[in-house]
Amino acid sequence: MQVILLDKIVHLGQVGDQVNVKSGFARNFLIPQGKAVMATKANIEHFEARRAELEATAAANLAAAQARAAEVTALGSVTIASKAGDEGRLFGAITTRDVAEAVTAAGVKIAKSEVRLPNGPIRTLGDHDVRFQLHGEVFATLDVIVVAE
């Protein structure tokens, strides 16, 4: 099924690309979420008229994500207190939600879906590097310090 991409899709294409995708992927994901439209003659003409507007929106989203990434890296580190045993292991774990709440409390609004924990939930005390994916191609790294309560 031929579709026109209205947003950058990782491993698929850029704004304005006409790509051939499976019909289920188009009907169930791309079209309902507003990331693509069917590649009919009318839609192609309509898209060409709106191309500059869509590219400007994509550029604005990228700039906003880069600004947020600069804010996250400017924080330097965030401290999270959690209950821990004598050997430095936590009772429970620090998840993406906990990291997102700590960063938001520090002054930068982050959604838990933007937090990337490469080794899974944090289960030990100490310093941990956490990566944030704020946009498809914008990443930020922050040092999360886990201390015992």
Swiss-Prot record:
| Record key words, sorted | Ribonucleoprotein, Ribosomal protein, RNA-binding, rRNA-binding
- Report the leader peptide range: none
InterPro entries of this UniProt entry?
Ribosomal_bL9, Ribosomal_bL9/RNase_H1_N, Ribosomal_bL9_bac/chp, Ribosomal_bL9_C, Ribosomal_bL9_C_sf, Ribosomal_bL9_N, Ribosomal_bL9_N_sf
Q: Which domain of life is it from?
A: Bacteria
Q: Name one GO molecular function term.
A: rRNA binding
Annotated Gene Ontology cellular component terms: ribonucleoprotein complex; ribosome
GO BP terms: namely: translation
So what family is this one in?
Belongs to the bacterial ribosomal protein bL9 family.
* Xref: PANTHER family: 50S RIBOSOMAL PROTEIN L9
Function, as annotated, reads: Binds to the 23S rRNA.
Protein known as: Large ribosomal subunit protein bL9
